[in-house]
A protein has these predicted regions:
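Structured loop/turn residues at beta-strand edges in well-structured enzyme cores
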Residues: 25, 49, 61
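Non-catalytic, surface beta->alpha helical segment in thiol-disulfide oxidoreductase systems
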Residues: 56-84
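Short glycine/proline-centered loop/turn elements that form peptide/ligand docking sites
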Residues: 31-35
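Alpha-helical elements of the RecA-like P-loop NTPase motor core of helicases
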Residues: 14, 18, 39, 74
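Structural micro-motif
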Residues: 45-55
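Local sequence-structure signature of Cys/Sec-based thiol-disulfide redox active-site neighborhoods
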Residues: 1-28
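Residues at alpha-helix termini
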Residues: 23, 44-45
Length: 84
């Protein structure tokens, strides 16, 4: 499961969603102001400075931080896969 933290009118957020849809990955999209606040974003991603912020659930209680869209694209390009 991929979790994408994005914001409205963010081209890289849209690209991350499109990439997940094209690859058939299960994902959730959370939008700033609707699903989380900036404060909550910084609690989960203290070094975040751009959108989107993306993580992958490895196990029920374990998340691996991927980064932004470019890092997600590299992750997918190298054939890294995960299970839900």
């Amino acid at each position: 499961m991929i979790e994408i933290f994005g914001k409205p009118q963010c081209p890289f957020c849209d690209r991350a969603v499109s990439l997940c849809e094209q690859r058939g990955y299960e994902f959730t999209y959370k939008s700033l102001g609707t699903d989380f606040t900036r404060e909550e974003l910084f609690e989960s991603f203290p070094t975040a400075r751009t959108f989107p912020q993306i993580r992958v659930r490895e196990t029920e209680n374990t998340w691996t931080y991927i980064g932004g869209y470019d890092q997600l694209a590299e992750f997918v390009k190298h054939g890294d896969v995960w299970t839900d």
